[in-house]
């Protein structure tokens, strides 16, 4: 980082931007989708607090670091080649743009093109003409929200598929208890251990995380 000559206002903005890193870690990486799928899976099984939220977020963070490791490595190389220059706002903008290029490429690759086009059309309607005319599909102002929406949509699609077999187990257990005249027995009492057994037998956690990893190839 070049700090021999720097503008105080630029330096203050740079420090403020660093405080946004935790939020960017959520919205600009695979953390959002992975954490959503893990939480939905826990709810589908029926164990509301096992694993606890902190444990699931820790698993999601570890999985995110695994998936994003090549991207972070490329960003580190970019910043090493072109250190942040705080001498002016334009130089800082150029340094940051070059540094986040690998992350932007990752988000663009994993963004639904239809969502990106839709947001670009909305920008034409909502933004001033001189601003919307200068924005293309590679602009972070479009890529970040499009990526977030794509991750949300993909997470709910995966969650729906995860719910199906567990709902089938609930229905089967309920019908069997009804046929046996055991209406006083709560279906969850029997379906919960069956769902946990099924998930363990198919090595569910490993298969689930593998599927999430491969979705970013």
From Swiss-Prot:
Family: Belongs to the FliP/MopC/SpaP family.
Subcellular location: Cell membrane
Name of the protein this chain belongs to: Harpin secretion protein HrcR
InterPro entries the UniProt entry points to: T3SS_IM_P, T3SS_YscR-like
TM region positions: 11-31, 52-72, 158-178, 185-205
Organism: Erwinia amylovora (Fire blight bacteria)
Annotated Pfam families: FliP
Principal localisation: membrane
Record's bilayer topology term: Multi-pass membrane protein
GO cellular component, one term: plasma membrane
GO biological process terms held by the UniProt record: protein secretion; symbiont-mediated perturbation of host programmed cell death
Superkingdom of this protein's organism: Bacteria
Function noted in UniProt: Required for the secretion of harpin.
UniProt entry keywords in alphabetical sequence: Cell membrane, Hypersensitive response elicitation, Membrane, Transmembrane, Transmembrane helix
